[in-house]
């Protein structure tokens, strides 16, 4: 059992084989003798161990024997067993038990396993020719050969062999050492083997011949391809022989597969002009490819491999080929377009296999087309062009020569440019005409001209200035000079003596590629400007802005794109500003774009190249952005929607304020623009001084230099009495709650001003009284009464509180404000402030009514008018309310005018009566002196003095009011007080009588008395002043 494994020793296997062969006859005889006796024995009395032992020996012999002698002995045993089993089945059919059946099955299984094992061993041994299989590239040949034939053809046909092939035939063992029975068996093979062997051999020869034929066809095909692509004569056979001699063993293996090798990225052929395109947008067609690739040169062919199956369509990208007329143009296209984004697809280019190039391209770039067009008319014979005009077509025309010599000189230096006609019918007619003229002579040309004088196709024979005639004349001359119809000389020459130079067309201008001038023209658009986006980047930005939503991821992706292209920050800012200026954009997109601006500004301080440019460029555009947002905010019809939009914009302002991106005044300005409080157009008109930008030159005025003129007032040496924000010392002394005695005594002792007094320090009494008389307190009360009557009842208490607070604030303001300005504008300011407050209150009422009306419209409580939008209907309602308010205002003014007239009339009557009844000063003194009893004088005083004393009290109160409002004349206030004290006998009663005189007025209202009673310290001050 030593030779079961392939790695076993060869000597042991040979010994066992020889012993098996010599003892085979005895073993067979023993099997013949013992077989029937054993089988006839009953199963109960049959000894089991010898049977098992004999069976094992038999199986061992069968497994070890692999010679053909065993194949002859095996059919004998099978026949004997078959006959024996038949006899047994016929005689003792019923005596078979389950164990016997199992043993028979085991025997059959073991025999089958032994046969499989023999085949396995025969596969590793070359002695058995029936099992040899050979492999040839391109097909399988089952050649059953003898050993000597396989040895002869071992190197020619591929045959797999194990690593122990060298040890298969050891030197000490030859074919003679084998047993004679084995040799006899080999000679007794059937004659069919020879026929099969001859048939296999012929197939192999035929296969070899077929391979040679394929190789020859392949070489011929490569030669024809190279000749067509380069317009060259066929290559010599030496090149093909040299190729066939290189690496014969490798060529034998791969020659059949070479034609099917992929060539999309093959750079082995240096003459190919075909480019492979591996990633094309499915929406791109051949015309687009021509426009994209045609910028680099004329194209020979363009092809897109359109998808045919569902699998190819699922890839969502196409591939194709673009062939140029010239290798240099193809190299430039590969260099400039590889990796470029075209219609959002990255171009992946490579070299493809060479294709036949046609004589005429399918696409000619416009820059090259211009050079192949005929020149403009010049007026010279044969449309000759001056050299300067030929180099620069835009050069101005030279003036016509004055004499013949100048004309001849210009003509001799001019160049006649020959251009091949592009119309194929005309070109064929010219060639046919030249053919007959060369054959028949000039008489044929004259006859044709006479016959076809009215035929437009033969116009080239008569019009000498046309490009067709120039080509006809040159082609005829070239053929007569011996040039070939397909090859001609391209040097400049003179056709006529002292005539112009003729410049023939190039042989094939499309094979030479584009000139350097044309290349520069084609690449004018190619280099991208620094700080500008490319076309595909601009398209991507616009696509991002169109699809932007207020989602975190979308805004983050857009912000990353902006920062990655920060070198083009200005263009990106302009694009975003433009997108925010469209009113029809939905509100969520507007909010998303504003959030994008906020994100970019927040990240403008990040460590990214050129990111800080966004802060600079957005600063110049934010005013426009928020003006457009204000326009959008005004067009929103729904109240809740507009408030939501406003809230989102205001959150951006709060975030920017926290980030400190821009100064706070600038953010307040932007907020006012958004709310509509400031208009950009008005600001631009008022702004005369340009903005101070980084890098702008600073003007000559620096800190420390004297300024000549500020606000139009020249600065003198005189000190400024009043500065905004600086409290005046004289005002600081007079505070609420401080007794006036101590303060005024201190004022007398202290010097008031250390400099020369101004004209405002001393005020004439007459001017002060005149100013006091101009404003009447009763008129102010009337205005307040009328405004309060017209206000809504729901807001009466609020308006009263507002007026009280305003009155107290106005008093405090008068105490601390500038006396110089307030004395001049006191009366006007009081009326204006009260009127403005009235107007504001009325406008608030109108806006409340309008908002209520708008809510009712939106909720459906009020019907919508056909043909009007919500906004138009609301505006119409607002105009109605304003019109009503104007009408009421006019009625009030009329009533006021009537009341003013009545007041003036009543005052004039009272003054006349007073003048009549008031006695002179002397008469009063006489009465006081001559009165015997105080009771009479007192009674007379009580009867006669009410009107003058009430008038005096009114005037004194007006003067006190003026003095309290203007504290600039503190020196005069005690003087006035003392004078008034002299006029009135009892100073303590004057305020009480003035209060009675106020109560006697018919227009006194309870509201005003309430407001007067709420400031008791003021009346206290007045009483103390009167005491002084």
Swiss-Prot record:
GO MF assignments: RNA binding
Residue stretches of biased makeup (Basic residues): 45-54, 990-1028
PTM annotation (Phosphoserine): residues: 67, 202, 236, 484, 787, 799, 810, 945, 947
Family: Belongs to the splicing factor SR family.
Cell compartment(s), UniProt: Nucleus
Organism domain of life: Eukaryota
Basic and acidic residues compositional bias, start-end: 55-64, 97-111, 144-155, 186-222, 239-249, 809-840, 873-921, 949-979
Organism in which the protein naturally occurs: Pongo abelii (Sumatran orangutan)
Record flagged with keyword Nucleus: yes
Lineage, top ranks: Eukaryota, Metazoa, Chordata, Craniata, Vertebrata
Chain positions with N-acetylalanine modification: 2
Compositional bias of kind Acidic residues: 785-805
Cross-link (Glycyl lysine isopeptide (Lys-Gly) (interchain with G-Cter in SUMO2)): 80, 145, 168, 208, 747-748, 759, 821, 828, 831
Name under which the protein is recorded: U2 snRNP-associated SURP motif-containing protein
Key words of the record: Acetylation, Coiled coil, Isopeptide bond, Nucleus, Phosphoprotein, RNA-binding, Ubl conjugation
């Amino acid at each position: 059992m030593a030779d079961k494994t392939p790695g076993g020793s060869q000597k042991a296997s040979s010994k066992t084989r020889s012993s098996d062969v010599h003892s085979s006859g005895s073993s067979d005889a023993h099997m013949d003798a013992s077989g029937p006796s054993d089988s006839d024995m009953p199963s109960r009395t049959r000894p089991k161990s010898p049977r098992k032992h004999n069976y094992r020996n038999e199986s061992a012999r069968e497994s070890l024997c692999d010679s053909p002698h065993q194949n002859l002995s095996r059919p004998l045993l099978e026949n004997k067993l078959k006959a024996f089993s038949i006899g047994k089945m016929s005689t003792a059919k019923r005596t078979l038990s389950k164990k016997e059946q199992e043993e028979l099955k085991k025997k059959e299984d073991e025999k089958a396993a032994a046969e499989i094992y023999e085949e396995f061993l025969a596969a590793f041994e070359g002695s058995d020719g029936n099992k040899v299989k050979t492999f040839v590239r391109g097909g399988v040949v089952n050649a059953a050969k003898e050993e000597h034939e396989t040895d002869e053809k071992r190197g020619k046909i591929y045959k797999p062999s194990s690593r122990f092939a060298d040890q298969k035939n050891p030197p000490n063992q030859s074919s003679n050492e084998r047993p004679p029975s084995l040799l006899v068996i080999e000679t007794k093979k059937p004659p069919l083997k020879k026929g099969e062997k001859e048939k296999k051999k012929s197939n192999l020869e035929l296969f070899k011949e077929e391979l040679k034929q394929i190789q020859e066809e392949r070489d011929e095909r490569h030669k024809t391809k190279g000749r067509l692509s380069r317009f060259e004569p066929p290559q010599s056979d030496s090149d093909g022989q040299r190729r066939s001699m290189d690496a014969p063993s490798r060529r034998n293996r791969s020659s059949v597969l070479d034609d099917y090798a992929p060539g999309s990225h093959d750079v082995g052929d240096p003459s190919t002009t075909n480019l492979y395109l591996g990633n094309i947008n499915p929406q791109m067609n051949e015309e687009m490819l021509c426009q994209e690739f045609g910028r680099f040169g004329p194209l020979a062919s363009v092809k897109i491999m359109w998808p045919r199956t569902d699998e190819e369509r699922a890839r969502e990208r196409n591939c194709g080929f673009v062939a140029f007329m010239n290798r240099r143009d193809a190299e430039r296209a590969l260099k400039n377009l590889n990796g470029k984004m075209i219609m959002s697809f990255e171009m992946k280019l490579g070299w493809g296999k060479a294709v036949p190039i046609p004589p005429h391209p399918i696409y000619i770039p416009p820059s090259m087309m211009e050079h192949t067009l005929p020149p403009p008319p010049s007026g010279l014979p044969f449309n000759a062009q001056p050299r300067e005009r030929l180099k620069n077509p835009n050069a101005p025309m030279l003036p016509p020569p004055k004499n013949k010599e100048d004309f001849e000189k210009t003509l001799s230096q001019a160049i006649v440019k020959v251009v091949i006609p592009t119309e194929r019918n005309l070109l064929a007619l010219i060639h046919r005409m030249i053919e007959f003229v060369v054959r028949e002579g000039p008489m044929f040309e004259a006859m044709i001209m006479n016959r076809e004088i009215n035929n437009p196709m033969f116009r080239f024979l008569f019009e000498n200035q046309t490009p067709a005639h120039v080509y006809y004349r040159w082609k005829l001359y070239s053929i007569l000079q011996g040039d070939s119809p397909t090859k001609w000389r391209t040097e400049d020459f003179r056709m006529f003596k002292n005539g112009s130079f003729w410049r023939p067309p190039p042989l094939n201008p499309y094979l030479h590629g584009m000139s350097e001038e044309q290349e520069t023209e084609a690449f004018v658009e190619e280099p991208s400007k620094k700080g500008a986006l490319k076309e595909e980047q601009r398209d991507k930005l616009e696509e991002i802005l169109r699809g932007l939503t207020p989602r975190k991821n979308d805004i983050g992706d857009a912000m990353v794109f902006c920062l990655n292209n920060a070198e083009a920050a200005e263009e990106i800012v302009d694009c975003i500003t433009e997108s925010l200026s469209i009113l029809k954009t939905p509100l969520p997109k507007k909010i998303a774009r504003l959030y994008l601006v906020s994100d970019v500004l927040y990240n403008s301080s990040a460590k990214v190249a050129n990111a800080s440019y966004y802060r600079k460029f957005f600063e110049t555009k934010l005013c426009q952005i928020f003006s457009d947002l204000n326009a959008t905010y005004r067009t929103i019809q729904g109240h809740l929607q507009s408030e939501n939009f406003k809230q989102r914009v205001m959150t951006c302002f709060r975030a920017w304020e926290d980030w400190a991106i821009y100064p706070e005044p600038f953010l307040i300005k932007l907020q006012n623009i958004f709310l509509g409080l400031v208009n950009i157009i008005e600001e631009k008109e008022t702004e005369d001084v340009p903005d101070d930008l980084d890098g702008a030159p600073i003007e000559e005025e620096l800190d420390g230099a004297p300024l000549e003129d500020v606000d139009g007032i020249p600065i003198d040496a005189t000190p400024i009495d009043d500065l905004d924000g600086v409290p005046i010392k004289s005002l600081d002394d007079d505070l609420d709650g401080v007794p006036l005695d101590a303060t005024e005594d201190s004022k007398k002792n202290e010097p008031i001003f250390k400099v020369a007094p101004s004209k405002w320090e001393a005020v004439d009494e007459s001017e002060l009284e005149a100013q006091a008389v101009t404003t009447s307190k009763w008129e102010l009360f009337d205005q307040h009464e009328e405004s309060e009557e017209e206000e809504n009842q729901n807001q009466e208490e609020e308006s009263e509180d507002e007026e009280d607070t305003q009155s107290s604030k106005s008093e405090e303001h008068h105490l601390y404000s500038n006396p110089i300005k307030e004395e001049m504008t006191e009366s006007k300011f009081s009326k204006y402030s009260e009127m403005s407050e009235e107007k504001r209150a009325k406008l608030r009422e109108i806006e409340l009514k309008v908002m209520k009306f708008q809510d009712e419209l939106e909720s459906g409580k009020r019907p919508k008018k056909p043909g009007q939008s919500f906004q138009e209907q609301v505006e119409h309602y607002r105009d109605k309310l304003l019109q009503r308010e104007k009408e009421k205002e006019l009625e009030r003014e009329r009533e006021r005018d009537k009341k003013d007239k009545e007041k003036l009339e009543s005052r004039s009557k009272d003054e006349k009566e007073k003048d009549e009844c008031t006695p002179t000063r002397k008469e009063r003194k006489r009465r006081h002196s001559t009165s015997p009893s105080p009771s009479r004088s007192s009674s007379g005083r009580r009867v006669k003095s009410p009107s003058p004393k009430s008038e005096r009290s009114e005037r004194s109160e007006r003067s006190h009011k003026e003095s309290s409002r203007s504290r600039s004349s503190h020196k005069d206030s005690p003087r006035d007080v003392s004078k008034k004290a002299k006029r009135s006998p009892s100073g303590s009663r004057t305020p009480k009588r003035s209060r009675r005189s106020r109560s006697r007025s018919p227009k006194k209202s309870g509201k005003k008395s309430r407001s007067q009673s709420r400031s008791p310290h003021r009346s206290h001050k007045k009483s103390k002043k009167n005491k002084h």
